[in-house]
Amino acid sequence: TYAANTEGYATRIEALDREFADFFAGVEDRTMVFGDRFPLRYFAEEFDIDYYAAFPGCSTQTEPSAATIAFLTDKVREEGIPTVWYIEFSNHLVADSIAEAAGVKTALFHTCHNVSTDELEAGATYVSLMEQNLETLRENL
């Protein structure tokens, strides 16, 4: 039934929230650099993540300034940040550029705002995408 499905899904979301909280409780350095837009402000606030991004919020800008790229590259180097993040449907050229200059890797953080046809056909849900994010964070933060 609808009510039972709703309750079950809410329970899964609550469990996932606890998993994120448990994960971040064990992470000393919570600084993330996004070579992309940053539509994750509430997520960052919830889990006390410091972040830097090439574009503010969901900006429609297409190119960051050279100064922004230099700042982010320096930040990655100075703080020993192991990964530069990008979001889904990004060409991640900015993230790749920063990561290459700093000698680190890149990784996808799925905002769950946009889902590809392939993801839909594979049965992607908010919970499954956030579970993937948690695994990616474990591997890259």
Model-assigned labels for residue ranges:
Residues 1-141:
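Extracytoplasmic metal-acquisition and chelation regions
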